[in-house]
A protein has these predicted regions:
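Generic structural signal for well-ordered alpha-helices
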Residues: 25, 60-63, 82, 86, ...
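Acidic-and-aromatic substrate-binding clefts and catalytic sites of carbohydrate-active enzymes
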Residues: 72-84, 103-110
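Substrate-binding cleft of extracellular glycoside hydrolase catalytic domains
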Residues: 87-112
Length: 112
């Protein structure tokens, strides 16, 4: 597990299959306490999926959840509410890496 300024950089190389459930829970709590350098961020809550339009209030709620635990967020799209992430993240002191979800749908790709 890589660390930077006390924050977890990556879990690459951690052999989770060789850890007990108790050890995994302890690892999770340690990571949440010390924080992560960055995290991939999804706006969706239970029952939601890509294609659903996500409002600003939900984006703010989701950012508030992760804010104490990370410095960076990576998003996966620039439409359907995801376009709100960079501004709201910045308002909360987080940096962003914005992604675009591309596929065979040229029109949707242009929106992204």
């Amino acid at each position: 597990m890589g660390k930077r300024l006390g924050r977890t950089l990556a879990l690459a190389g951690v052999q989770t299959s060789q850890k007990s459930e108790s050890e995994l829970i302890d690892m999770f709590h340690d990571i949440m306490k010390t924080g992560m350098h960055g995290i991939c961020f999804s706006l969706y809550e239970d029952g939601q999926e890509p294609g659903d339009i996500i409002g600003e209030e939900q984006v703010r709620r989701r950012v508030e959840i992760i804010k104490p635990h990370t410095e960076w967020v990576r998003s996966f799209s620039c439409i359907e509410g995801n376009e709100l992430i960079p501004r709201i993240a910045k308002e909360n002191g987080l940096k962003t890496l914005v992604g675009a979800w591309l596929n065979d749908d040229t029109e949707k790709n242009e929106e992204e």
